Amino acid sequence: MGHVLHGTPDEAYFQTRYAVLREPLGMPLGSERLSDDAEAVHAWVQDGGEVIAVGRAHIIPANSDGSGADHKGPGAAPIPAFGPLATHSCERPAFQIRQMGTLPSHQRRGYAALVLGELERLMVSEHGCKTGLLQAREHAIPFYKSQGWSLIDEPYTIGVIGPHRSMMKEF
């Protein structure tokens, strides 16, 4: 069984992120990189030197509704605002989980839960966050529900990535 790590990710982390989240959609190498990766909190599971599950979180600025771009490269799809941030109906500071993924050969073994739990722990204990938000691909919604996250907002589509739902968890 792998163990969860956090800190500054190496290239293997980004290779796993690309292999799981972008390459299957035919997106170019580099689309796995986000403009704020250097400031984000990263967690991953490593097993025998192989990065098998990844995820990241960032604090949503106090003046932001969470809208933005899907990645830092050209042609990035827009990401909609989170309703509770736009209407000021959730507690700040708030954080967003992004880029969660597990290699297909290691899925359904609890690795994503380890990564998500570590990100939640770090954002609450080290950054004082009170609310978490994320945009889940449709197939991932049952996983996030099992971890205590609730659906908010209506379904929407993010470019070639596909249908998503926004979710929230209060801490």
Task: Tell me what each language-model feature is.
Residues 1-13:
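A short beta-loop-alpha structural element at the N-terminal edge
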Residues 20, 122, 143:
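Short alpha-helical functional segments enriched in proximate histidine and acidic residues
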Residues 110-112:
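Conserved G/P- and acidic residue-centered "switch" motifs that form tight phosphate/ATP-binding loops
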Residues 115, 140-143:
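Conserved short alpha-helix immediately C-terminal to the canonical SAM/SAH-binding motif I
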Residues 133-135, 145, 150-166:
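Conserved catalytic-core motifs of GNAT/GCN5-like acyltransferases
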